[in-house]
């Protein structure tokens, strides 16, 4: 079925018909759990006409509302103690753990109740990043410049979480994006960077495909399309310089580059990878450049970028949520693995100097990582990665 048009610029259909060359591709990303170190949990105390809740939440208002609804009291009779969470990343905006704790506490008024989910409870009952499927078509003119971009997005759940096409940072004169959202009985919710991790993988990966089809260096190709995005261009130039783009690499190594703006901040990353004959991907180095306005706390910026890249490496190389016979297959870190310390590459963090107001840095470094790795794999092997997580079998020599 036709999707809802979310971006319509120029005349993409006419430009595609007139293009000297067209390229098509399909991308898919799975449901994604947040993999919290601290499982979902909450404590509640129900007394005569009032409720008190202790929750490592990202939002006190939804906690207050669901506690009031569950206990049958006015919202003003709910007191929330917001605790520091052991990981959240969007999952703790959905306080279903609070509902359970309050429901139990309501049965034994005056007795505090603490409900802690098991790891399996947390992973198999997540509010997942939606599964998304993407059909793309790009048109190039005779000089290899992009003239048309068509992107059909399909996904499960809230259309707000699927993407809109506004995530595309590169200047293409004719763009058409539509979104088809299917409501299915799988709970979905925001995941660190919301739409940008999957949209970044798709839009930068496909831009890299256009560069290859045009026979152009991907850095130079992308650079030429960022004239109206000077902050992101500054990140792209800085990361290319710091990574030594174009310089010789060890035998079997290759680099990929990606850039994306999100939440008022800007980030570009270069990943250096190699692929073994068995198809195993090793990321040797990641170089990141961010534009986040005035730097207030340099070590905090570095830590946030490193953490974002660590999380992005996990969903790029390691895990996704699988449904079988109506149930989630994965349940713990044995079948939903995270990047381990011994697998983590060195990460270099560079900041574009700025005297503008500070902007966020916790989420923007997440999206460029997956396309940077996938683009590097293409440079190393000639094989395109259009699905995550990356499976070794797809790259076996």
Residue ranges of model-derived segments:
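Glycine-rich, small/acidic residue-mixed loop/short-helix segments
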Residues: 308
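Generic long, charged, amphipathic alpha-helical segments
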Residues: 334-360
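Short beta-alpha connecting loops at secondary-structure transitions
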Residues: 187-192, 256, 293-302, 359-362
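Substrate-binding beta-hairpin/strand module that engages nucleic acids
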Residues: 118-120, 324-342
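Structural alpha/beta core scaffold segments of enzyme domains
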Residues: 1-291, 324, 346, 350, ...
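C-terminal structured "cap/appendage" subdomains that terminate the fold
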Residues: 355-374
């Amino acid at each position: 079925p036709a999707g809802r048009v979310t971006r319509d610029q120029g005349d993409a259909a006419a430009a595609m018909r007139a293009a000297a060359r067209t390229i098509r591709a399909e991308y898919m990303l799975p449901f994604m759990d947040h993999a919290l170190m601290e499982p979902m949990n909450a404590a509640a105390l129900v007394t005569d006409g009032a409720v008190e809740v202790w929750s490592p939440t990202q939002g006190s208002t939804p906690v207050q509302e669901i506690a009031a609804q569950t206990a049958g009291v006015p919202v003003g009779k709910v007191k929330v103690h917001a605790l520091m969470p052991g990981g959240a990343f969007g999952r703790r905006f959905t306080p279903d753990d609070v509902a359970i704790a309050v429901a139990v506490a309501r049965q034994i008024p005056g007795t505090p109740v603490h409900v802690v989910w098991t790891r399996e409870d947390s992973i198999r009952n997540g509010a997942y990043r939606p599964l998304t499927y993407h059909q793309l078509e790009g048109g190039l003119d005779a000089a290899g410049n992009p003239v048309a971009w068509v992107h059909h997005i399909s996904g499960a759940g809230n259309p707000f979480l699927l993407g809109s096409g506004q995530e595309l940072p590169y200047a293409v004169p004719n763009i058409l994006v539509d979104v088809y959202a299917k409501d299915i009985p799988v709970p979905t919710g925001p995941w660190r960077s919301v739409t940008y991790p999957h949209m970044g993988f798709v839009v930068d990966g496909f831009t890299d495909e256009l560069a290859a089809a045009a026979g152009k260096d991907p850095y130079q190709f992308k650079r030429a399309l960022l004239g109206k995005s000077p902050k992101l261009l500054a990140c792209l130039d800085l990361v290319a310089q710091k990574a030594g783009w174009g310089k010789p690499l060890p035998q079997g190594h290759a680099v990929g580059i990606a850039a994306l703006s999100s939440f008022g901040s800007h980030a570009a990353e270069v990943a250096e990878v190699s692929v073994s004959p068995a198809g195993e991907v090793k990321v040797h180095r990641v170089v990141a450049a961010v534009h986040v306005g005035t730097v207030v706390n340099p070590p905090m910026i570095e830590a946030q970028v490193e953490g974002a890249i660590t999380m992005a490496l996990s969903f790029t190389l390691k895990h996704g949520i699988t449904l079988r016979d109506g149930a989630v297959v994965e349940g713990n870190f044995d079948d939903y693995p995270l990047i381990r310390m011994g697998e983590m590459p060195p990460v270099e963090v560079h900041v574009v100097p700025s005297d503008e107001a500070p902007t966020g840095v916790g989420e923007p470094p997440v999206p460029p990582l997956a396309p940077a790795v996938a683009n590097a794999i293409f440079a190393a092997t000639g094989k395109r990665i259009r699905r995550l997580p990356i499976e070794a079998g797809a790259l076996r020599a």
